[in-house]
Amino acid sequence: MDNSVLQDAILNGLISTQYQGNALIGPQLLTNNQSSTIWQTLRHELLSCKNFTWSVAFITLDMLVPFKAVMADLAQQGVQGTIITSDYLNFNHPAMFEELQKIPNLTVRIADLNGFHTKGYLFDHGEYQTVIIGSANFTRSALLVNKEWNLKLSSRQEGSLFQQLTAELDAVKHESTVLTSEWIAAYRKNWQPPKTRVTQPEKLKPIE
C-alpha cells in the first residue's frame, strides 16, 4: 500500500474531508445500528489479517460460535491469533475458557492484573496495522446490540500510536500466563456467577 493512500485516509478522518478518504483504512467510529454492527467489522478484519492480538476483559460463549467458524477458515490460511483475557469479577464462564482452548490456531493468555478491563483488538495486515479500541467487550450484546463506541484506526508499525500500543501489549503479555487445563480446573472449582450481571436485551440480532 502506498504511503500517500494511508496518509490521506488518516488526514481525511482526523484533519479534513478535503483529503481523499478510504473506507477500508480510514479512521472510523464503530457503533451498532440498523445497517452494520461492530461484529461485522471485527469479522472483516479477522478474515483479512495475517495475525491478531486482542486484549479483552469479558467474553461470552454465544460469541464463540461465529468466532470459531472464522478461526477455522483462518487456520486453513495459516493465520494465528492471541487473546489476552482474565478472571476479572468472575464474569467469564469456565466453559468459555474450555471452548477457547479448543481452537488450534489461537493462543489464550490470562492476565495476572488487578482490574483488567481492556477492550482492544489489534490486527496485523502486513503493510499496515489496524486497532479497534473502545467500550465493546467480546460479548454478543456489545457486538450486536448495545450502544457502544469504538474507534478504528490504521497505521504503519512505525507510527507512534502503534509503538505505544505494542509496548502496552508486551507489558500485559509479560504479566500473563498461557491458559492451561489446570488453570481452568482451578477456576471452575472456585468460580461463582457474578452477583450482578449486565441485563441482556430481549431481542438480539442474528450473527452473520
Name the predicted role of every residue range:
Residues 1-208:
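PLD/PLD-like phosphodiesterase catalytic module centered on the HKD motif
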